[in-house]
Amino acid sequence: GDVYKRQAIKQTLQSQIRKYPATCGIKVNTSYNSSTGEITVNAALKSSEGGEYDLVYVLVTDGLTASGGNENSYDYTVKAISNNYLSMSTDGRFTVDANQEHTAATFSISNAKNLNPATSRVVVYALRKVDDAYMVDNITECSINGSIDYLYND
């Protein structure tokens, strides 16, 4: 169920980011319409070596959850996730040349009413095809009404 999915996503991201250095940067801007409960996400990707990529979004809200014993652990709840979260989509994937930018990724997240902008964020990560497997190449996060520019892992 959802808890398993959440754990799987976290573990996947953590293990893969350690193993493979990023080849791309991700730029995101978002706008939140609280009356319709819709978040529009525009994402762009710039690649240092080129390749086949796909962009995935996850809408999360932060919160404290009790975890065994009495200490609280920082956690987040996945509110929405695109269908391609562990393998590339057929229609969304794209190939980009080295040092080029792909700017056509726009996502619409609906049913996002009553979100607190202070604790809600959109996580966007890039999947890259490596040896017939899909690896998480880079990940960034942005508030639900904001923007984040390219950050490179040097």
Which residues does each predicted region cover?
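Short, conserved sequence motifs used for protein processing/export or organelle targeting and
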Residues: 1-154
